[in-house]
């Protein structure tokens, strides 16, 4: 939205269209990859994509006709009411969808949704009108004179009016149908208008839409037949209404529809939207734990004033305010266009794939990694189903008695949703029994929890299963012995009863998928306020994700009068990084487009001399750039380099606009649930403020203060987290073409009427800003609670930099000495003739166990150079990550050099990494079960069928699975404007004493679940992750803290092995994998070992070892693999002891020094003014109320 001006022109138009397309022109193969469609229903949800579901010139912003109003006292004239809005990012197929292939073979998903809906107490779908009033798909086809057997019908609807269509308050103007071109085929479309076109001055939902002569009918007007289609209403009830109802905790789903639809017609509504008889889940919130004592709250329903009643009131008011603010967002207009399939690089030019089907399938497997993360994370927004309440001090950061922003908060509690229902007073609803409440302790995952998150929508559930089927079972991250193939085989032979499947469909059953992923699925029970796992997309070109984030940014630098902005930008840290990277690219060490790619360095490093020359050149370039930056900042820009470091943040932004995530119904759903969760978090933070000093139990409290709460939430914009922009909306043409109210809806007569916008200024929610402080504050505020002080003390310990010596293999050049070992030391051989690999060589060398005389003088110099560089880097290093490529090394070295200039000491800085979703062909038989096509009736047939499918994988274009790679160069990933999954906790605070302005900070937090979410993720307080899936180059053009027991996993054990100084760590890791995952090691490839070890060199050695076992006589088996690995270990341990050894320590007697000692040469740095740099440590900045999240 950066490009949106202050004024936008809109054309008046209908509230939606019914598209009628011939089935023969439907690109069914492409739509099958993008659609949400279950196996037991023909209805489907598709993305709104130009060239695929709508025409290429489709206009997504519109001034929609909301009704008419009379003008003048006696003139009898009428004008149109026009409301700015945009089109919903999905379309709804309600007839003829049988031509689209279901996205999963899982049977009976509609039945599963109905059973879960009944279990959790949400209202079931009931027809909003009698069958006699239905406009069937066949009738629509007949009116269009099209063959009903060969037509597919779908709804394209504006965001504001989707609930209006569900409530049958609209009609089809058959006479106004026209023809558009989609995918080189003629497609008919019928405009949809609200009934209020013939009901002037009627500002609410009509409860008698099928009455031929309602009381409000305009003079001379003919009442059209209201549009009601049962399949469409059922689809809207599931995908639109139920998902919102679950997010807002409202069991009466029709109440959601009526509340949202009312706002379409009454733009001045300020009262409540949700009914007073809304029910709530009965549960006891977790009280705070202090001094080791657990103070349990009272039973639900017996809470005194200020307890359960206020929590339920806050829950209802937050839901009501969110529903109203959703209307504000729905009335936004966006410059960013809807997706256009003809501009998707993988669609138009699928380089590297057989065709676009294979390219799309591979990309959707990437997306599966992020969707899986939202399912596997226990703090994902899709599970935020209840409101918790803090104890007496838990929600406060200080001991003051002022109302806390953190008293009420959302919790992930699907395990409580089946509890009995109570009213706002805490009394059980008729027929409910409070004694049947579920314990709030940790609960095992159930398919019903996923169905609840999907809003009981079978189409959405099917699409989620589509993605989960492409996620692995977590064998690398979880220590378990589950063999899904054997489990399914046994279940088929035993004919185990299942409500959803029989023997022939057991391999496809949703329960089978859940069982395969059981070790990755979350457990619930934690009721404390924390970070939420959000989904979004980056559309902004700007973010600060380099090592020092927003340090020395443009807005903080002094600018001389008349000086060009371009000149000032040259003295920013951001441009310094770019300049450094370009200089290194010129030297052939990396490429700026992909700085993790080592191909350029491989071409330039040919021997030891070229290696030393490359490292020395890089060091000189970085120190020169750092010196110049510091000089300019202090002498020209008058920038306080120390305080600036304390203010620096890593920043990125998530777009609010819907179309960036609009390529799939699940992504659109996740984006919407994120907005709902964020708005509710804001609303709940204001509830305790609104309630303070008021009689919350009073009958009219909600009526009086609901509008106050909404206004307070809207005032939180542009205060640190949610950014918005106010624009002026005007009409392209005051004369709007609409159906003549006095004619039949089948008549083609058009009336030109004058239109007026109900509002000319529109508030557009733009972005959610995420921040991560570069420096750890380290201070403990005196007024902080004991719990806060305890947490801060733990953080201080985690950030404290240890004084241990950095190992060469784990140091700054570790990646390089392993990669180029054969070039650096090509002639080094042991006395027994063995050629040591990099690991063995450096372990022996650093232990002074390498036999004397095997290193030449030149080789000694090379090893000493590496050791000196490692020590020099270690002395000034405050980044708790080892570089993995020259791009990492360059950015870390520059950051550490700047930190040295600023005399930074003691604490590690915060670092960030991106986990990038990638796709590959599956090798695990358990993953490919959903793709088996031949009928399975015997358990013994499952394994052979899976193996046969794996053997013929190249013949199946659609079979791909998700995996991840890791990079510390987050900036290069953000240029692809990726989809993002990230943990965020939102802090709220007053700007200064006495101020009523509430500011917020979206703090970069953790995605709960650790390696269950992604095997590359590890818990480290100094390290933050963002999970990404690139969009640019695929579906977008190139633009000009966890509680509980920590399980010991394969990756944990491997990292422990690698931290030990073993001469053959690759063999040790291989043996460990054989012990923990057994025969599955055979299926593991280089990418798998990369995930486990996070070391390319070691991974290549293990992969080679695995191939040696495969090629050995007798083929691969676990015993042979273990024997070969043991031989490797024994050979590495055979150190000659009959002669003198090379004393490596004696080579660097002058290198001893302290960790915080001076290591950067004064002459090299050429500091212009020593007094500028020899300052005291950075002063701590403290505010009266310090949020732990903000540290």
Swiss-Prot record:
Region (Disordered): 288-307
Coiled coil stretches, renumbered: none
Zinc finger motifs (unnamed), residue ranges: 498-511
GO CC annotation terms, alphabetical: host cell nucleus
Function: Plays several crucial roles in viral infection. Participates in the opening of the viral DNA origin to initiate replication by interacting with the origin-binding protein. May disrupt loops, hairpins and other secondary structures present on ssDNA to reduce and eliminate pausing of viral DNA polymerase at specific sites during elongation. Promotes viral DNA recombination by performing strand-transfer, characterized by the ability to transfer a DNA strand from a linear duplex to a complementary single-stranded DNA circle. Can also catalyze the renaturation of complementary single strands.
Subunit note: Homooligomers. Forms double-helical filaments necessary for the formation of replication compartments within the host nucleus. Interacts with the origin-binding protein. Interacts with the helicase primase complex; this interaction stimulates primer synthesis activity of the helicase-primase complex. Interacts with the DNA polymerase. Interacts with the alkaline exonuclease; this interaction increases its nuclease processivity.
A molecular function GO annotation: zinc ion binding
GO BP annotations listed: DNA replication
Region (Required for nuclear localization) residue spans: 1166-1191
Cellular compartment(s): Host nucleus
Family note: Belongs to the herpesviridae major DNA-binding protein family.
Protein name per the record: Major DNA-binding protein
Domain of life: Viruses
Keywords assigned by UniProt, alphabetized: DNA replication, DNA-binding, Host nucleus, Metal-binding, Zinc, Zinc-finger
Keyword hit for Zinc-finger: yes
Pfam families cross-referenced by the UniProt entry: Viral_DNA_bp (PF00747)
Lineage: Viruses, Duplodnaviria, Heunggongvirae, Peploviricota, Herviviricetes
Motif Required for filament formation: chain residues: 841-842
């Amino acid at each position: 939205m950066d490009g949106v001006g202050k004024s936008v022109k809109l054309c008046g138009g209908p509230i939606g269209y019914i598209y009628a397309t011939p089935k023969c022109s439907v690109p069914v193969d492409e739509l099958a990859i993008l659609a949400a469609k279950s196996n037991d229903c023909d209805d489907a949800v598709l993305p709104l994509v130009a060239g695929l579901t709508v025409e290429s010139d489709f206009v997504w912003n519109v001034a929609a006709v909301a009704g008419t109003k009379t003008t003048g006292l006696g003139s009898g004239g009428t004008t149109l009411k026009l409301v700015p809005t945009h089109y919903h990012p999905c379309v709804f197929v309600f007839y003829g969808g049988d031509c689209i292939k279901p996205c999963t073979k899982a049977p009976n998903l509609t039945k599963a949704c109905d059973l879960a809906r009944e279990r959790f107490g949400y209202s079931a779908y009931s027809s909003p009108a009698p069958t006699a009033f239905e406009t069937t798909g066949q009738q629509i086809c007949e009116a269009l004179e099209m063959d009903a057997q060969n037509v597919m019908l779908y709804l394209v609807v504006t965001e504001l009016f989707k609930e209006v269509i569900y409530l049958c308050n609209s009609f089809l103007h058959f006479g106004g149908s026209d023809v558009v071109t989609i995918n080189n085929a003629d497609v008919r479309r019928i405009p949809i208008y609200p009934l209020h076109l013939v009901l002037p001055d009627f500002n609410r939902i009509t409860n008698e839409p099928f009455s031929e002569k309602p009381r409000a009918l305009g003079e001379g007007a003919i009442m059209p037949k209201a549009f009601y289609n049962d399949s469409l209403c059922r689809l809207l009830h599931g995908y639109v209404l139920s998902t919102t109802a679950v997010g807002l905790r409202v069991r009466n789903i029709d109440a959601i529809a009526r509340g949202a639809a009312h706002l379409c017609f009454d733009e001045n509504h300020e009262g409540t939207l949700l009914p007073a008889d809304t029910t709530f889940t009965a549960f006891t919130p977790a009280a705070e734990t202090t001094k080791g004592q657990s103070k349990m709250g009272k039973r639900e329903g017996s809470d005194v004033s200020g307890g359960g009643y206020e929590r339920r009131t806050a829950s209802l008011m937050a839901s009501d305010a969110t529903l109203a603010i959703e209307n504000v967002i729905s009335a936004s207009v966006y410059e960013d266009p809807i997706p256009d399939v003809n501009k998707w690089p993988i669609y138009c030019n699928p380089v590297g794939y057989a065709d676009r089907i294979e390219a799309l399938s591979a990309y959707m497997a990437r997306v599966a990694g992020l969707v899986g993360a939202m399912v596997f994370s226990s703090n994902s927004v899709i599970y935020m189903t209840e409101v918790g309440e803090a104890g007496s001090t838990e929600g406060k950061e200080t001991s003051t008695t002022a109302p806390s922003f953190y008293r009420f908060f959302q919790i992930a509690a699907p395990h409580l949703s089946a509890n009995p229902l109570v009213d706002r007073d805490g009394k059980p609803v008729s027929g409910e029994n409070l004694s049947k409440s579920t314990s709030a302790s940790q609960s095992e995952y159930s398919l019903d929890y996923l169905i609840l998150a999907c809003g009981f929508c079978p189409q959405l559930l099917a699409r989620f299963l589509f993605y989960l089927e492409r996620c692995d079972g977590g064998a690398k991250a979880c220590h378990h012995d589950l063999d899904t193939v054997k489990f399914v085989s046994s279940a088929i032979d035993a004919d185990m009863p299942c409500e959803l499947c029989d023997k022939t469909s057991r391999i496809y059953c949703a329960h089978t998928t859940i069982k395969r992923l059981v070790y990755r699925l979350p457990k619930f029970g934690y009721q404390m306020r924390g970070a939420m796992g959000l989904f979004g997309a980056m559309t902004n070109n700007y973010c600060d994700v380099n090592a020092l984030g927003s340090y020395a940014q443009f807005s903080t630098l002094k600018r001389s009068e008349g000086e060009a902005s371009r000149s000032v930008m040259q003295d920013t840290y951001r441009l310094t990084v770019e300049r450094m990277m370009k200089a290194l690219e010129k030297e052939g060490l990396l490429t700026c487009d992909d700085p993790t790619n080592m191909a350029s360095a491989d071409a330039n490093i040919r021997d030891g001399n070229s290696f030393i020359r490359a490292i020395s050149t890089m060091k000189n370039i970085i120190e020169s750039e750092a010196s110049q930056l510091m000089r300019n900042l202090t002498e020209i820009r008058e920038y306080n380099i120390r305080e600036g470091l304390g203010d620096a943040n890593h920043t990125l932004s998530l777009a609010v606009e819907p179309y960036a995530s609009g390529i799939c119904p699940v992504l659109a759903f996740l984006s919407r649930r994120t907005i709902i969760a964020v708005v509710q978090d804001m609303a709940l933070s204001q509830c305790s403020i609104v309630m303070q000093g008021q009689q919350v139990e009073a009958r009219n409290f909600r009526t009086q203060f609901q509008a106050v709460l909404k206004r307070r939430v809207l005032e939180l914009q542009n205060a640190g987290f949610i950014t918005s922009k106010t624009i002026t909306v005007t009409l392209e043409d005051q004369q709007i073409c609409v159906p003549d109210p006095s004619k039949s809806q089948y008549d083609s007569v058009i009336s030109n009427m004058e239109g007026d916008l109900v509002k000319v200024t529109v508030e557009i929610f733009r972005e959610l800003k995420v921040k991560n402080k570069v420096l750890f504050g380290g201070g403990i505020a005196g007024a902080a609670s004991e719990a806060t002080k305890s947490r801060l003390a733990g953080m201080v310990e985690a950030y404290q930099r240890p004084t241990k010596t950095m190992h060469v293999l784990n140091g700054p050049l570790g990646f390089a000495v392993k990669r180029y070992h054969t070039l650096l030391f090509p002639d080094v051989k042991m006395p027994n003739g063995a050629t040591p690999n990099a690991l063995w060589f450096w372990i022996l060398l650093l232990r002074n166990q390498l036999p004397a005389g095997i290193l030449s003088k030149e080789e000694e110099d090379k090893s000493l150079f590496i050791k000196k560089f490692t020590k020099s880097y270690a002395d000034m290093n405050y980044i708790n990550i080892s570089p993995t490529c020259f791009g990492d090394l360059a950015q870390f070295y520059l950051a550490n050099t700047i930190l040295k200039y600023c005399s930074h000491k003691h604490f590690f800085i915060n670092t960030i990494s991106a986990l990038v979703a990638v796709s590959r062909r599956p090798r695990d038989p358990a993953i490919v079960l959903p793709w088996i096509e031949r009928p399975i009736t015997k358990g013994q047939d499952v394994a052979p069928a899976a193996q046969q499918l794996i053997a013929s994988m190249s013949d199946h274009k659609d079979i791909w699975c998700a995996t991840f790679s890791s990079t510390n160069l987050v900036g290069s990933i953000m240029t692809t404007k990726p989809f993002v999954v990230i943990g965020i906790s939102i802090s709220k605070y007053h700007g200064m004493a006495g101020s009523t302005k509430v500011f917020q900070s979206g703090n970069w937090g953790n995605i709960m679940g650790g390696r269950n979410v992604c095997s590359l993720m590890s818990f480290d307080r100094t390290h933050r992750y963002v999970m990404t899936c690139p969009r640019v180059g695929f579906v977008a053009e190139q633009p000009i803290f966890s509680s509980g027991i920590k399980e010991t996993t394969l990756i944990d054990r491997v990292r422990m092995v690698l931290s030990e100084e073993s001469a053959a760590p690759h063999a040790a890791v291989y043996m460990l994998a054989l012990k923990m995952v057994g025969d599955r090691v055979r299926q593991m490839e280089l990418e798998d070992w990369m995930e486990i070890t996070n070391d390319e060199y070691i991974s290549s050695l293990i992969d080679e070892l695995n191939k040696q076992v495969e090629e050995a006589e007798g083929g691969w088996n676990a015993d042979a693999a273990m024997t070969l690995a043991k031989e490797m270990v024994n050979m590495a341990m055979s150190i000659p002891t009959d002669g003198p050894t090379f004393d490596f320590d004696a080579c660097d007697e002058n290198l001893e020094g302290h960790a915080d000692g001076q290591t950067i040469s004064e002459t090299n740095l050429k500091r212009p003014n020593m007094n500028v740099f020899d300052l005291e440590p950075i002063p701590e900045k403290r505010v009266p109320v310090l949020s732990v999240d903000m540290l």
